[in-house]
Structures are given as structure tokens and as C-alpha cells.
Amino acid sequence: MDRMKKIKRQLSMTLRGGRGIDKTNGVPEQIGLDESGGGGGSDLGEAPTRIAPGELRSVRGPLSSAPEIVHEDMKMGSDGESDQASATSSDEVQSPVRVRMRNHPPRKISTEDINKRLSLPADIRLPEGYLEKLTLNSPIFDKPLSRRLRRVSLSEIGFGKLETYIKLDKLGEGTYATVYKGKSKLTDNLVALKEIRLEHEEGAPCTAIREVSLLKDLKHANIVTLHDIIHTEKSLTLVFEYLDKDLKQYLDDCGNVINMHNVKLFLFQLLRGLAYCHRQKVLHRDLKPQNLLINERGELKLADFGLARAKSIPTKTYSNEVVTLWYRPPDILLGSTDYSTQIDMWGVGCIFYEMATGRPLFPGSTVEEQLHFIFRILGTPTEETWPGILSNEEFRTYNYPKYRAEALLSHAPRLDSDGADLLTKLLQFEGRNRISAEDARKHPFFLSLGERIHKLPDTTSIFALKEVQLQKEANIRSTSMPDSGRPAFRVVDTEF
């Protein structure tokens, strides 16, 4: 028995010293002995055991199928030879000399596995041979999914490449960008391609960078989805989901008279998407009907985040040259740069009124005229209604007449008392007095939509509820429906 222990010890020393472990693939190689017995000399105690070439073998398998070690017992005699080498053996012991490697069968990977792992659309069409390639070598399943690994995997599928998308029609053009209707080869779905020209001296416009940085982190049923980003030397292309029209075109197609039930659904979705943005500390800052996209189902989505920005603290100073004039609040018109989420709520009130009446509430062409329209309906502010207003130099300069506030119901007769109350709470002079998006969507005006609509996950459409349906418009025009049966896409404002 002492001699056997000596043999085992020497064999172990030989295995450790005979060949190092290759770590080139990130994991140790599996080492085993060949089927043949160890052919040592007659006196194993005098010399180290010699292993014939080929007896040590390394097995390197793919990461996805780590080999399983199977020990097969060999009978060895007291002279150190196996029964294969010597037919006579007086004392038999079992020793795990022979090691055979057994590979697990490759993992079967499905399209659903890839979609879930990489957060891809369910209708994605993977390139030919991609599944077979992953079956042989599947790093996205065998390693933690780092940002770099995810980027490489998406590129292999076709994301980030211009050739993945087919341009169909030119929808509009701005100072820096052109928007095209397009089609994705990956999903066969329509997309909107916002192609931003890169000036060599200036690089990408800050509005484009801002839009990308914010949208890639905003995941909500009422916010337009950014599908892809393609960066070349000459352009930056943003690939958005395609929606049929914007709210301005919807109003035009309805003869400026939207069914009041649909007004309620659109307003709720606007508030729902905006409340999510504000929870993420993002201000849109450019709300207007042209930036609210609507599809055939009636889903409304916030778009064009070119002027949006992340809000760090409520008192941060921002530019007052934001928000299209008609939807700009009076405190911003008078030069205030001290604002937070309330800047968006004034615009919501203006859009609510426009949906209910079919006309803009304050259609001024200059800042002075815009303020005049506001004060003529809501009343000229005083120290009682707007503390500190008389110390505002711009306000004193304009020297507006002393208007008395008018009842909003007289201007929007289709609103009920709850609707008028909500509109009043949105159209407050001081931002701090305006109702928040979160509180506004819980207003009694929306009671008829039921309780379940408030419990939906962020990424679920309100139309997932069977009790929520868009009603047919009485005056809808069919001119916006092309021969394909899909309504025309209204281009998002591309001016930067």
C-alpha cells in the first residue's frame, strides 16, 4: 500500500509539472489522461514517472457547453501496471486514472430568447444563420450582458446600419434635419427616419444630442419610441416608430370638432406620458399639437424632445426662449428663467382648450400680443392675483388695460363643470399654482374612464382595457387616408 501511495504522489507531481493550464479562453482547460496505461520503468521509486506523448490531452470546449468529467475505474496491480498491461494482479485497488470528456449538447436558442435578452421587438426578423451561429457560440447568454456586448450583438442583427432601413417618402425638412417615411427590413414595419446633418465645424446640434440622450431612457406607452440610432460621418439618423398623424392634423380632419369622449382620452394620455417624464425629472418644454402623435388606434404619444431637458433641481435657471409662443406661459413670456415641471402644464391647458373648441386659446404673433390675449381672458394680473407682478419691468412697460377675468365656460361651452375646473387649474399665472400632471390625471373629469386605467403599467396602452375605446368622429374627413389604407404621417417639427 505504501508503494501505491508513492506511485499516486509521483503521478500527481507529473500532472502538475508536465503541462500548464491554458487560460487563453478565460477558463482553465480540462486535462485528462489517455486510455493507455502509464508505461513507467521497473523501479518507479528511483525515477519520475514518464507519461508518453498523447497521454495528456487538453480539451477546450465552447463556453456554452462546459465538458463534464467522467471518471472510469481502472484496476491496477501491485507492480503499478494496469490489468491491460499485465494479466496477473495480486492486490486490486481502484484509481481514477482514465478521464474521458463528455460535452453537453449545444443549447437550443430561439428567437424569443434573443428578443428577451436584448429587449427587441417581438416581430424582429433575425438575419439568416444568426440563430445557428448563436447555438455554436452564444456569448450573450454565457456572460453578463455588458453594454459593449449588447452593442456588438445588436450590430450583428442589423441595428445601427443605414442599409437596414428603406427610405420611402420625404415628409419634411428643417434647418438641420430631414424626416423620411421609411421601412425596417428587420420588422417590415414603417418607421420615421429623422436624418440630422452634421456640420464639420459644429458637429451634431445640441438639440439632437439632447433628444437622443433623453429618449433612450424614456420607456412609456405615451412617449414615442426611439428604435435605433445610426451615426455616420455626415449624418445622425434617429429611427422612430411611425405614427399616422399628429394632433393638429387630427383636428383638421375632424373639422376642428373632436368627440368630447376622445378629447378626454387624448388629454388623459398626454397627462399620463407627461407625469412619467416629470417623475424622471424631464421637462418637455415644447408642448403643442404638432408634437403629439396619434395612431389609428387612438394612442397619443409625446414626440420631439429636441427642446426637452433633464431637470436637476427645481430652481435651476433655464432659457426662456422655449415653447412655441401660443403655448408659452405668462411667467416665461415675462422673462422668468426660474421654473420646473409647471412650464409644461400651461401648454397642457392650452391644448385641452384647443381640442374642446377647435381653435387656439391665445394665438399671439408677438410676446406683447400673446400676453394681451392671455390677460383679456384671464384678467390683467394685480398684486393680489400675482404677487410681485408690479415689480416686473417688462409688465410695467407694456402698460396693459385692466381686464376682468372671464368665465372659461363661456369660451368653451362643450366643457362640463369638471372640465372647466381642470382647465382653470392648468391656466394659472404663477407656475407654482398650476396643477401637476400626476394630480391632473386623477381629476374628477376622468372619473368616467374607470379605476383600472390608473393601475396600468407604464408601458401598457390604455386601449388594452376593453372598456376604453376611441369613439367614431362625426365629421372625420377621409382625405388623410392614402390608398394603402394608412393615414398620412404628419412630420414632427424638425426646426432646431
Swiss-Prot record:
InterPro entries: CDK (IPR050108), Kinase-like_dom_sf (IPR011009), Prot_kinase_dom (IPR000719), Protein_kinase_ATP_BS (IPR017441), Ser/Thr_kinase_AS (IPR008271). Disruption phenotype: No visible phenotype in females; they are viable and fertile. Male mice are infertile, due to a defect in late stages of spermatogenesis. Residues 69-78 have a biased composition (Basic and acidic residues). Highly expressed in testis and brain, and detected at lower levels in heart, skeletal muscle, adipose tissue, lung, spleen and pancreas (at protein level). Ubiquitous with highest levels in testis and brain, with longer form predominant in all tissues except the testis. Changing residue 95 to A: Abolishes phosphorylation by CDK5. Impairs normal dendrite development. Residues 83-93 have a biased composition (Polar residues). Residues 1-95 are annotated as: Disordered. Phosphorylation of CDK16 is essential for the binding of CCNY, but also essential for the regulation of CDK16 kinase activity. Phosphorylation of CDK16 is essential for the binding of CCNYl1, but also essential for the regulation of CDK16 kinase activity. Ser-146 and Ser-153 are the critical sites for the binding of CCNYL1 and for modulating CDK16 kinase activity. Phosphorylation at Ser-153 inhibits kinase activity. The active site is at 286 (proton acceptor). The modification Phosphoserine is found at residues 12, 36, 42, 64-65, 78, 82, 89, 95, 110, 119, 138, 146, 153, 155, 391, 478, 480. Belongs to the protein kinase superfamily. CMGC Ser/Thr protein kinase family. CDC2/CDKX subfamily. SUPFAM superfamilies: Protein kinase-like (PK-like). GO terms for biological process: exocytosis; growth hormone secretion; neuron projection development; positive regulation of autophagy; regulation of insulin secretion involved in cellular response to glucose stimulus; spermatogenesis. Its EC number is 2.7.11.22. The keyword ATP-binding applies. It catalyses: L-seryl-[protein] + ATP = O-phospho-L-seryl-[protein] + ADP + H(+); L-threonyl-[protein] + ATP = O-phospho-L-threonyl-[protein] + ADP + H(+). One of its GO terms (cellular component) is plasma membrane. The keyword ATP-binding applies. ATP binds at residues 171-179, 194. This is Cyclin-dependent kinase 16. Found in a complex containing CABLES1, CDK17 and TDRD7. Interacts with BRSK2. Identified in a complex with NSF, syntaxin-1, synaptotagmin, SYN1, SYP and CDK5R1. Interacts with YWHAH, YWHAQ and YWHAZ. Interacts with CCNY; this interaction increases the CDK16 kinase activity. Interacts with CCNYL1; this interaction mutually increases the stability of CDK16 and CCNYL1 and increases the kinase activity of CDK16. Interacts with NSF. Residues 165-446 form the Protein kinase domain. It is a peripheral membrane protein. It comes from Mus musculus (Mouse). Keywords: ATP-binding, Cell membrane, Cytoplasm, Cytoplasmic vesicle, Differentiation, Kinase, Membrane, Nucleotide-binding, Phosphoprotein, Serine/threonine-protein kinase, Spermatogenesis, Synapse, Synaptosome, Transferase. Changing residue 153 to A: Increases interaction with CCNYl1. The modification Phosphothreonine is found at residues 175, 380.
